[in-house]
């Protein structure tokens, strides 16, 4: 499972011009599900993201998590995060999970994040073409892969 996490002042996602999820200050999580991901990857990644101390404390140090700041989390599925560009110029998406595997893991990730936040995470629509709008804060952008745990 691979995620691009962006600290945002605000973010929203729309499908066919209709906003399906929006947050004020918090984290935008672009989430790619790999073909070999398991519920253990979901649990680890959700825990890691919710505990990341990338919000400033009273002294201006990155020392607070999205949970501690009562921020929002917007999760958007994005299989293209699993692209391989090793050969040629056309990306291969063979590492991405097929929709029948990816969708339940995406839903489980949303549930895990919501549980850790103590409120629902906002989301896009799995498999849909979406328009994502965001205002970066920092910018602070991290890439985390559950198969490369550090």
From Swiss-Prot:
Location of this chain's protein in the cell: Cytoplasm
Task performed by this protein: An aminoacyl-tRNA editing enzyme that deacylates mischarged D-aminoacyl-tRNAs. Also deacylates mischarged glycyl-tRNA(Ala), protecting cells against glycine mischarging by AlaRS. Acts via tRNA-based rather than protein-based catalysis; rejects L-amino acids rather than detecting D-amino acids in the active site. By recycling D-aminoacyl-tRNA to D-amino acids and free tRNA molecules, this enzyme counteracts the toxicity associated with the formation of D-aminoacyl-tRNA entities in vivo and helps enforce protein L-homochirality.
Protein name per UniProt: D-aminoacyl-tRNA deacylase
RNA-binding listed as a keyword: yes
Keyword tags: Cytoplasm, Hydrolase, RNA-binding, tRNA-binding
Motif (Gly-cisPro motif, important for rejection of L-amino acids): 138-139
The protein's assembly and partners: Homodimer.
Domain comment as written in the entry: A Gly-cisPro motif from one monomer fits into the active site of the other monomer to allow specific chiral rejection of L-amino acids.
Taxonomic superkingdom: Bacteria
Gene3D superfamilies, A to Z: D-tyrosyl-tRNA(Tyr) deacylase
């Amino acid at each position: 499972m691979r995620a691009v996490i962006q600290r945002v002042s605000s973010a929203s996602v729309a499908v066919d011009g209709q906003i399906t999820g929006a947050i004020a200050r918090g984290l935008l999580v672009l989430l790619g599900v790999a073909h070999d991901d398991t519920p253990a990857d979901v649990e680890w990644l959700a825990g890691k993201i919710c505990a990341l101390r990338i919000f400033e404390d009273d002294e201006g140090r990155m020392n607070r998590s999205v949970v501690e700041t009562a921020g929002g989390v917007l999760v958007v599925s994005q299989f293209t995060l699993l692209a391989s560009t090793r050969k040629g110029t056309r990306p291969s998406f063979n590492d991405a999970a097929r929709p029948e595997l990816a969708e339940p893991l995406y839903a489980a990730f949303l549930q895990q994040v919501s549980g850790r936040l103590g409120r629902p995470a906002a989301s896009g629509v799995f498999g849909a073409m979406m328009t994502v709008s965001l205002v970066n804060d920092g910018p602070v952008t991290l890439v985390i892969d559950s198969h490369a745990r550090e």
